[in-house]
């Protein structure tokens, strides 16, 4: 879509003001910001409305609001704008994104409500719809709720919060187990089981000549309990899944789920083992139990 320089300038300022004030913006406010004649702004707004880039809100508190098409016309999403989605009936609602989340009645004994400010058409949603908001970018916050109100003018969904979850924005290298015990591939399962019992661990990397060659767990030993004197190299898992120390625990969970594993070996820039992180470690962190050596 080809816009004139003036149209792009006005549209960008409308978006800036709308983000700042979160309400319909009057033409006089845009004129004041751009040092332009209000009549010029009014004429250009008519053209922008015809292009479906701007919606007009009537009434004393009315004004102009940008449509989702306006953001695309200015290439804002293509420049890396973070999209926080909304899902309804398990499907992502296209053309709608969350720009602000507010919690109220948090001290109420029997309920908690939230105001979900969006960009896009609120008419995609109806009272009683069950929705999922998120995850947000930074802390991967996900909110599940039931819509109990809708403000079409200010583009707000009022929901009864059914549940909230969050995955802290923490590097695996900051919370992983740093005291790593490794196993030689020529050790027997009996020797490995003894080490696991002494060190209170349930798995370990297998290292040969400083090279990571596999991983062995209590589950592997249990499956071979009738052959307890087998060598580790005969039963270890060879497709070792690693994660860089600077990756986040959210990324670790995704890798674990994708590869159906319960632990990852943490490595540094030189692919040297610097720790281990398990699914249990992550669940403890999500529940608020951080390791004693945690630091950021």
Curated annotation (Swiss-Prot):
<protein>
    <recommendedName>
        <fullName>Uncharacterized protein MJ1232</fullName>
    </recommendedName>
</protein>
<dbReference type="InterPro" id="IPR016436">
    <property type="entry name" value="UCP005063_CBS"/>
</dbReference>
<dbReference type="GO" id="GO:0003677">
    <property type="term" value="F:DNA binding"/>
</dbReference>
<dbReference type="Pfam" id="PF00571">
    <property type="entry name" value="CBS"/>
</dbReference>
<dbReference type="InterPro" id="IPR046342">
    <property type="entry name" value="CBS_dom_sf"/>
</dbReference>
<keyword id="KW-0677">Repeat</keyword>
<dbReference type="Pfam" id="PF03444">
    <property type="entry name" value="HrcA_DNA-bdg"/>
</dbReference>
<feature type="domain" description="CBS 2">
    <location>
        <begin position="236"/>
        <end position="292"/>
    </location>
</feature>
<dbReference type="InterPro" id="IPR000644">
    <property type="entry name" value="CBS_dom"/>
</dbReference>
<dbReference type="InterPro" id="IPR036388">
    <property type="entry name" value="WH-like_DNA-bd_sf"/>
</dbReference>
<dbReference type="GO" id="GO:0006355">
    <property type="term" value="P:regulation of DNA-templated transcription"/>
</dbReference>
<dbReference type="InterPro" id="IPR005104">
    <property type="entry name" value="WHTH_HrcA_DNA-bd"/>
</dbReference>
<feature type="domain" description="CBS 1">
    <location>
        <begin position="176"/>
        <end position="232"/>
    </location>
</feature>
<dbReference type="InterPro" id="IPR036390">
    <property type="entry name" value="WH_DNA-bd_sf"/>
</dbReference>
<keyword id="KW-0129">CBS domain</keyword>
<dbReference type="InterPro" id="IPR051257">
    <property type="entry name" value="Diverse_CBS-Domain"/>
</dbReference>
